[in-house]
Amino acid sequence: MSGSEFESLEKTLEKHIPDAELKEVKRILFGKETKKLALPACAVEAASARDFELQGYLFEASPEQLRPPRTVRVGLIQNHIVLPTDAPVLDQITALHKRIGDMVDVAAMCGVNIVCFQEAWSVKNEPVCLKTLLKCRFSAMPFAFCTREKEPWTEFAESAEEGYTTQFCQKLAKKYNLVVITPILEREEIHNVLWNTAVVISNSGSILGKTRKNHIPRVGDFNESTYYMEGNTGHRVFQTQFGKIAVNICYGRHHPLNWFMYGMNGAEIIFNPSATVGGLSEPMWSIEARNAAIANHCFTCGINRVGTEYFNNDFTSGDGRKAHKDLGHFYGSSYVAAPDGSRTPGLSRTRDGLMVTEMDLNLTRQISDKWNFKMTGRYEEYAEELTRATKHDFKPNIIRE
């Protein structure tokens, strides 16, 4: 069975492990059992009719005497490119927006308050550029940064404030009263520079702000620094009606200090919109966001795209392999992790999907009070050592005979 045919780890465990042992296996792998969330019949029927997976789970906190529950529902959306890559561009643009609109519609049926799309999901759809885009065979921004080609991929970059994708998401936010996190390829017009950016749109429909990818990969086929460099927005946290949220884009999940700084700035939920493939990172995927939730007393949400994307021209990986036309299989498997170490099952590795998760944000403080990682963190000592380690004349503290 190829990686692109293997649907999910959870379903394989359920298929092959006896029930008596399965519960313990899941407890060890995934933490305490996450309760299933009852979803409206209309949403379940709509997801089935629109051919995408719908899952719902619940993280509870202990009742408190002085604080009411702070219940929030988040929706994670993973999706393929909609039409074949040789379909007319305008048809693909229409199809993709309909697809995402249909999935957000179901999220709204489920009472979702915050929805997040996968990394670089957006399309370019401004009339002034349509003639140029007729050369391109993708509707969604494919993860084309493996190719090192500038054209036509840079044509997908757009303004974070005024671009069509932002306007499209503003309408969704206002229509459904939800916060939308929309990762795009941004063109900053003042300096004419590209960035990998996530725009955060308030449930009022206004733009709350944007944040840029802090860490840029130079590994395998991920040649992203050919297009954009490390972000310059720091570790912004956005105060929304539904809690304080942050966006740690893709490769940033490999850097513990990146998660740490979002947590230090007060994030209660950190989203990790990604585009990553099985041959490179899948063994790490189920671990990293969960570890970050534990270490930083917060909820984390990993979102990954699905499918295999093929390009017209061959490209190489710098590893001696023959030139090839695809990056590998994007394995989906989006999930949510809680500060107590528990996590939801992942969405499918092969299908479009919507993960709806209800969480009580009171759990973040309760777990912080229990484990005291921030109290016992000794940040001042580490700050001093890190400062020394960044100096050109740093000498490691190694004791020898």
Label the predicted regions.
Residues 126, 201-203, 337-338:
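Short, acidic, Ser/Thr-enriched surface-loop or helix-capping motifs
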Residues 1-69, 304-401:
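C-terminal beta-strand edge segments of enzyme domains
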Residues 57-113, 271:
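N-terminal active-site segment of His-dependent metallophosphoesterases
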Residues 292-301, 308:
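Acidic, glycine-rich loop-and-strand cores that form catalytic or ligand-binding grooves
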Residues 182-184, 196-200, 236, 302, ...:
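Short beta-strand scaffold segments in enzyme catalytic cores
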Residues 129-130, 140-148, 199, 210-217, ...:
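Short beta->alpha transition motifs characteristic of CBS
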Residues 74, 103-152, 173, 180-181, ...:
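Active-site beta-strand/loop signature of hydrolases that rely on acidic residues for catalysis
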Residues 158-161, 167, 171, 176-178, ...:
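Active-site catalytic loop in hydrolytic enzyme cores
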